[in-house]
Amino acid sequence: MSDNRALRRAHVLANHILQSNPPSSNPSLSRELCLQYSPPELNESYGFDVKEMRKLLDGHNVVDRDWIYGLMMQSNLFNRKERGGKIFVSPDYNQTMEQQREITMKRIWYLLENGVFKGWLTETGPEAELRKLALLEVCGIYDHSVSIKVGVHFFLWGNAVKFFGTKRHHEKWLKNTEDYVVKGCFAMTELGHGSNVRGIETVTTYDPKTEEFVINTPCESAQKYWIGGAANHATHTIVFSQLHINGTNQGVHAFIAQIRDQDGSICPNIRIADCGHKIGLNGVDNGRIWFDNLRIPRENLLNAVADVSSDGKYVSSIKDPDQRFGAFMAPLTSGRVTIASSAIYSAKVGLSIAIRYSLSRRAFSVTANGPEVLLLDYPSHQRRLLPLLAKTYAMSFAANELKMIYVKRTPETNKAIHVVSSGFKAVLTWHNMHTLQECREAVGGQGVKTENLVGQLKGEFDVQTTFEGDNNVLMQQVSKALFAEYVSCKKRNKPFKGLGLEHMNSPRPVLPTQLTSSTLRCSQFQTNVFCLRERDLLEQFTSEVAQLQGRGESREFSFLLSHQLAEDLGKAFTEKAILQTILDAEAKLPTGSVKDVLGLVRSMYALISLEEDPSLLRYGYLSQDNVGDVRREVSKLCGELRPHALALVTSFGIPDSFLSPIAFNWVEANAWSSV
């Protein structure tokens, strides 16, 4: 190196070392050259009344929802923090598992002290149930761990006591459960059995000498597993067990067992272990339970369906074991109802964040020296998010309808509720997971950051696809129910009534070969194609099962061999039911901007559902040209929904504090001053 070059290098290094001002303070660098955050509200107008749309979407108890939002925002228990000039409340997912569990319980105590759970088990009627569902949904928007822990206590333990039990159980347990004097959990799932509840291996016998039941875990696969609340906090559990009376297995029954005393010590003849760290929901203390000759009073059998007398005689008004098991399972529908609705609120959080971010974040320019383009002005970005937004809208109406038929249920509607809740739970939770993944990718690297929520929510909600029924199993249950209804009506030569199959009493709809834009957006065309798909798949499914049975296969094995048709049919039934709920909501609206926008949303839901379903081509409902027409119309609808994007997510009614920093001033939230 020459002397001159060495001197120059030394001079540069000296300037670096001695420089006292950061580069940004250099007056020659204009601040205007830096990116500035511009709130979407400055450039995006609302083309309809967002408050009216919110009332439609939430469906019920808007005032109660806003009340509990306020309760959470005013307490430091909910991890208030300032980012980018705004206050946010969201869990600290960086805490240890033990810390997350304890703060979750403290948050529940806070909600209890402020009257949130008043009447949840002791008040009856549709209004009381809808209020409870609304408050639980807001808990889930804040933190899925809070809603799951509350849900296990009230909807699983509490509802089991309420619906499986009788007056003696109600008087002893319901008020104490509502006040958290008793903390309940629900021991159904075992290491070896989940969806197949009838196969569980826990065994209960009766001792007439002491008038006690004796519960045992006979093998390791019979240990109760994933029992929310069992690892730390629960004092009591509902035990699902095979009931053996005088050497005869009477099937699965439910019992109340104490597992901890009021000091938190584990009771004798009980062993409990922790399930450990999970991919999400670490605020819920999932545990494993073994029973070693645990004795409980005879009165602890939940006896609404069956009972055992003091001298050991088994008594039930329902003689058929299958019907008796069905009666036990019917009250558990509430779990699928709450899961379906909470999945949609999770999707709303993800879309609110991703769409708001895409309305302020820019990337690349399309003209030389031109301004960078907003992410949501790229057709590809619209294609990623706006169809999911439309689906979320349609599924909001579906979830509301499911809640309404659930709270107004009668013995005559139990079958329909089981079928609809199974389909909705599967399709809505799958939709949520797909939506969160797309939102995570749509916000780029910011989606990996925990405080921005969209990435974290994937782990928090992933479990929904398998608990309260594996989604694929639920789809097959839907198809089996439709099969049974179809065969029954044909055998009796009766018209179809119930399960939404009434359209099959009319002639088969004929679809036009040429699909124009107006045809594709016509509600009658959309209804026809959804009905045709369901009708044809049901006929194909029953025909295939019948052919297999004709070759000597059992009905159950025939169902297994026809699984592809069964899953296609389950999806077709559910998507048609969802379409009907948004059509019903739209029909009730007066002419105006809300109705117009909802019409666009409905068409987007219908057409994107058709575009994404390979069965339309597989079974020949649409030609390749038709599929191209649908695809082009979806792209047109993306452009028409784009101006409404901000208003559509604002209509979700989720307070800013429950979203994340990248939904707002992401520049200020990441500034050096915030470090």
From Swiss-Prot:
InterPro entries: ACOX_C_alpha1, Acyl-CoA_Oxase/DH_mid-dom, Acyl-CoA_Oxase/DH_mid-dom_sf, Acyl-CoA_oxidase, Acyl-CoA_oxidase_C, AcylCo_DH-like_C, AcylCoA_DH/oxidase_NM_dom_sf. Optimum pH is 8.5-9.0. Its cofactor is FAD. GO terms for biological process: fatty acid beta-oxidation; fatty acid beta-oxidation using acyl-CoA oxidase; medium-chain fatty acid metabolic process. Belongs to the acyl-CoA oxidase family. Pfam families: ACOX, ACOX_C_alpha1, Acyl-CoA_dh_M. It catalyses: a 2,3-saturated acyl-CoA + O2 = a (2E)-enoyl-CoA + H2O2. It is an enzyme of class 1 (oxidoreductase). It comes from the Eukaryota. Residues 1-34 form a transit peptide. Catalyzes the desaturation of medium-chain acyl-CoAs to 2-trans-enoyl-CoAs. Active on C8:0- to C14:0-CoA with a maximal activity on C12:0-CoA. Keywords: FAD, Fatty acid metabolism, Flavoprotein, Lipid metabolism, Oxidoreductase, Peroxisome, Transit peptide. Pathway: Lipid metabolism; peroxisomal fatty acid beta-oxidation. The keyword Transit peptide applies. This is Acyl-coenzyme A oxidase 3, peroxisomal.
